[in-house]
Amino acid sequence: MPSLEKAVVLEFINLLAVAILILLTGFFVAVEFSIVKVRRSKIDQLVAKGKKGAKAAKHVITHLDEYLSACQLGITVAALGLGWLGEPTVQTLLRPLFHKAGLNESLTHLLSLVIAFLVVTYLNVVIGELAPKSFAIQKAESITLLFAKPLIWFYKIMFPFIWLLNHSARLITGVFGLKPASEHELAYTEEELRVLLAESYKSGEIRKSELKYMNNIFTFDKRMAKEIMVPRNEMVSLSLDEDSISNLQETVKQTKYTRYPVVREDKDNVIGVINMKEVLFSMLTKDFSIKKHQIEPFVQPVIHVIETIPIYKLLLKMQKERTHMAILIDEYGGTSGLVTVEDIIEEIVGEIRDEFDADEVPHIRELGKDHYLLNAKLLISDVNSLLGTDLSEAEVDTLGGWFLTQNIDAEPESAIEYDGYSFKVKDINSHHILFIEVKKAE
């Protein structure tokens, strides 16, 4: 065979080898990202259904560290081979072109070397890394099922080298007193999880309601009972000394609650709680008289807790005590309010409204763009989240309380501007602010 033909064949073989090395890089990159991204629960479902390749895929993702090492070895070997073979091959193809252009040998060598480096790098990054990575992230399940077996074969063939490299790395990290990192043992901060959830919502993986629930859970253990309580002045209570079942009937007609705290003398002495279901069942019996029966036989024990207790601890305590209501006390032992299980659950799922809440005004009522009617009991933290403001929570918990710290002579239509918003009192009962209108300051 003439020397020219040999050179052409050799160049063709070299180009083919370069293409194979780039494809191998793409293979290992795609497999690496797909086995990390794929959900183990989904693979378990496919194994149960007998899906082809599912068992191999499960084996790979349950031994993730070993197979990630195999992928990294494959990428490294392919990259070294590409550097060793790719640039000289492309450089050889370019040199005749520069010679024909009349360039001297030094300039020809320099230009062909630089261009060959750029071409090989471009092809390797685009075809060998970026494209496979994007494809693997979007089609993680399919790629894992398709390439799990080839990856297992590669791992078995290269096992001595992988074992040697892993143990060498462990020895080096051990010298510095470090434990070897495990790629699949990832821990995320709360903020990182919030970002991941937000991205999942934007991509359509989760619904808006699910995003809201998860974000509420993150703040759940930071909330104190006093932040969600029904304050003392709004508690509807029954007096053990004065109220009969007949009086109770009138109270229920007006307020429509299921449970009521029972007090002796005043609200600082809450002795129990009464459940209207028990009263109703008794009223259905023939010998029950509304006028004669007192409420004392129906009074059940109620728990008392400090108002600063975290709501997650309070929920656990209420579950343990099998009660739906807790009385909150302040540092001086006086009653500050009450909390029900419903109040706590609403911190996760949002406001729960039954058939008797039809006339109740929501805490947040949107009137227009950057224009709201807010319940004065709304927590300052919720107001800041809604408006993007920075109202101080140092002294008070609620929007109404904050307004009074800014204007102690608040009355209807009193207004202040703060942090780019106008806050105006729309409804007030004595010194108790009920609703505040908020809109973007002009």
From Swiss-Prot:
Principal subcellular localization: membrane
Coiled coil: none
Domain of life: Bacteria
Topological relation to the membrane, as annotated: Multi-pass membrane protein
GO molecular function: flavin adenine dinucleotide binding
PROSITE patterns: CBS (PS51371), CNNM (PS51846)
UniProt cross-references to Gene3D superfamilies, sorted A to Z: 3.30.465.10, CBS-domain
Entry GO CC: plasma membrane
Name used for this protein in its record: UPF0053 protein YqhB
Organism whose genome encodes this protein: Bacillus subtilis (strain 168)
